[in-house]
Amino acid sequence: MKRTMFSLTLLLILSVALSGCSIVGSRISHALGDEENYIMNEEIITEKVESIDIDWRVGKVAITPWNGEDIVVKEKSDTTLTSRTKMRVRNQDGNLTVEDTAKGVWLLPLLFKKDLEVMVPVGVDLRIVDVKATSSSVYISELSVMDVNIESTSGDIVLDEMKVVGNTSLKSASGKIDADMKAGVTFKAETASGSINTSVSESLTSLDAKSASGSLSIAVKDTERI
């Protein structure tokens, strides 16, 4: 009897949560009135940006250089994007924040994932890059940054040809960490389940790498202090 009541309750919750949703094949998408639907969403930042703060739920996160003049923020999804599920982007006092709004909607993050790409003009020096990801792999390449802080609950972290003048902190609860970079002051990498492979400059004053279940590979480059 208790099992029957639990099943009925679960079905009722799901029916309420999915009301107002359209089902196409095996995909579910929210439709809000006559709102235009998107698969790709893009924001162009023309003002000066000194730091980037990303909070993402599910999908890949990439920060890469490009030859344009402005920072471009793009999200991609194989499921319809609406005002409830599109990212929230704001640039205030040089601090660019990108938030995955779907993370605040119950059940919605379980239905689809979105990939995020932030394209930074070549030659732009950033003060801070801070990324918090839940079920996302994070990839950052060829950027010059003062400090980097990346934290992922479940996903790989990859830094490729990075120049970090100050402090680097990389943490993944479940995922590998690969870092090829010039690091200025401190470097810290930690993963509970996954390998750590890093190549850093010898100018570091502190290096800390920990893996509860995985291999460690640390190479020190013979480079001048940044």
Regions inferred by a protein language model and the residue ranges of each:
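Hydrophobic core
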Residues: 12-18
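Acidic (Asp/Glu) and glycine-rich low-complexity loops/linkers
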Residues: 5-8, 20-56, 60-133, 139-151, ...
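N-terminal secretory signal peptides that target proteins for export/translocation
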Residues: 1-2
